[in-house]
Structure formats: C-alpha cells, structure tokens
C-alpha cells in the first residue's frame, strides 16, 4: 500500500497535540497550553506523526510529572523525537513515562510527607467561598521548594509569552506561592528578584551598605489554569506589594515584561490601593501638576514612573478633574515628541486626539472593574462618596 505523503497528514499543531492535566482524588482537570514554541519551535507545528497526542499530567499537590506520547504512525526514524523535546524541559530523572500506575503510586507516597512551608514564611491568608488559602514567601534555596518549582516551571513556558527558566542557584530569587490551606494544592506563584538601586552620589554612602536601597521586580506571575478567574491573582499581587511597601529597603516595585492581562490586574490593584488609602487626595489642581509633588508621591507609592502616571491619570478621570484632558495629552505629546514634530498642526492634533481617546477608553474599561470601598474624599477635591462597579 502506498504511503500518504501529503504534509497535512503528518502535520499537527503542537498546541493541539499537547494535553495538560492536573490530577487529584476526583479525577483530572484537562486544559490546553497557550504557547508551545519554547518546546516545539516558533511555528508551533510538529511534522512526521499521524494522529499525535502528547499527554503531560501532574499531581495537583506534589506536581510529580507524567508523560505519555501516542500516535498511529511515524513517517520515518529521522523525525524529531517529540518526547525528548518535552523531557528536556522537565526535571531530569523525575518524570514517569507511560506507566500510569507507577506514577500514581509514586505521587501518593510523596503526598504522605508533603508539607506546606514553615509558619514564619506565611505572609497572607484569605478565603474564597468556603475555601481557605495561604501565601508564603520562600527562597529557592529551600530543597522542597526548589523541587516543587523545578516541576512547575514548565507552566511558565506554556502560559507566559517569552518566559524562560530562571537561575535557581541565584540566591536573590524569591517565590511567593499560593496554596489551598487544607488540600495543599498549589494555586499559583510568582518569582521575584531584588536589584540594588543607585540613588545618586549624594544619597550613596559606602559606609552604610546595610541601608542600601533596592528595586523589587515581579518576574513570572502565574495562577494555574484550573484556578483562574476566582481572584487568586489579585490576592497574590496585593500580598507581594504589601510585603514590599513594608520593607524600607525597597524603593520601587517593577514588573518584568508584563502581558496585557497582568497589566490589567496591576492597574486595578494599584488604583484600588491609592484610592482606598486616599493617597492622592492632595493632588494639586494646577496644570501641569507640580513635578515635585509627582516625584514625592511616586516615591511614597513605590511605583515606577510610567505606572504612577497611569494611576494618576486614572485618578483624574475618576475624579472628573478638568485637568485630566490636558494632563494626559501633555504626557502623550512629550512621549511622542520626535514622531510628532515633523507633522503639520492638523495631523498632529488628530494623532493626539486619537491617542487620547484610545487611552481614555482603556482607563474607563479598567475603572469599570475596580472595587472601591465607600469613602468620602477631602473637600478640596470637591468629590464625595463615589463608587465604581466591582
């Protein structure tokens, strides 16, 4: 019988071929990856297999990995080994292949000794429905956490664009990790890093090395797919910010290459924080807003400049300030000065208005999802008791 050599017969999307599962006592929760190019290449296409199915499963507590690759036919022996490509991204000698019974037996045994981190690492507790959750701040130098992270980190490749594995031997990395308090299931986690921040010659004193300041960075931020949409991301972000706001050595909170969904989460949480604490109640009514006030408030809130300006602009919009339009257009103009300088006046105004409308629509979209506690603002702001929909 002649072999069907049509490319479509032997080609499959790696996103479709890869099947992910988190398994517990009630069965498996199945889901698909968002990205597979870190494993199978930029095209996210696998060639050379007919009816290829790749199964990657994890115990929902220990994250012990299991791999099983199935296909009806392989074009030839020169075809790239899809199983090896996947195993290269998983902890070496830790994966159980094909033998599902052995995998279940192994993770069941591991669960007997699996424990949450020590109580002194606990930074936050919260409830959603009738479930209790806990957030810990831990170091990758902890052997148990290091192994758990080794097993989980492939999820960053599969769900965070441009993600890569971190250097787990660098002691500066910390992880904030969320668990279900009773079941011990890992809900999600974020990797963080702190960099020394140079504050200028006048502020620097080498004799006070213990007082040196740092910039704290959120690197990878992930809530496992089965647990998304329940508010865990918000709780995790708030816990991180709370820790760093209380840390006098941290002068600025940054985020590494945030995607659109994380930007939304960050905007909502940061806006809620400044509004619920009335942090911008003394915002000047002058235009442009005094740069000294901006610098002072940015430092108090530990926000990088771009993020602070976004929050300030959302605040002005929320307060229906007459300064909102001019303040935002001023920033847009300054940011795009070189691109605008060669345009005629009519085109320049059109471009500014288009950018203004686009940002205003985006700000309104974010504000519509913000939860604001009932609060009376200072009389100087001329506003009181405004509430936004949660």
UniProtKB/Swiss-Prot annotation:
GO terms for biological process: DNA repair; subtelomeric heterochromatin formation. Keywords: Acyltransferase, Chromatin regulator, Cytoplasm, DNA damage, DNA repair, Nucleus, Transferase. Belongs to the HAT1 family. Its main location: cytoplasm. It is found in: Cytoplasm; Nucleus. Component of the HAT-B complex composed of at least HAT1 and HAT2. The HAT-B complex binds to histone H4 tail. It comes from the Eukaryota. One of its GO terms (cellular component) is cytoplasm. Residues 42-44, 193-195 are annotated as: Interaction with histone H4 N-terminus. This is Histone acetyltransferase type B catalytic subunit. PROSITE patterns: GNAT (PS51186). The gene is HAT1. Its EC number is 2.3.1.48. It holds the Pfam family Hat1_N. InterPro entries: Acyl_CoA_acyltransferase, GNAT_dom, Hat1_N, Hat1_N_sf, Hist_AcTrfase_B-typ_cat-su, Hist_AcTrfase_HAT1_C. It is an enzyme of class 2 (transferase). Residues 138-290 form the N-acetyltransferase domain. The active site is at residue 256. The record marks 173 as: Interaction with histone H4 N-terminus. Acetyl-CoA binds at residues 221-223, 228-234. It catalyses: L-lysyl-[protein] + acetyl-CoA = N(6)-acetyl-L-lysyl-[protein] + CoA + H(+). Catalytic component of the histone acetylase B (HAT-B) complex. Acetylates 'Lys-12' of histone H4 which is required for telomeric silencing. Has intrinsic substrate specificity that modifies lysine in recognition sequence GXGKXG. Involved in DNA double-strand break repair. One of its GO terms (molecular function) is histone acetyltransferase activity.
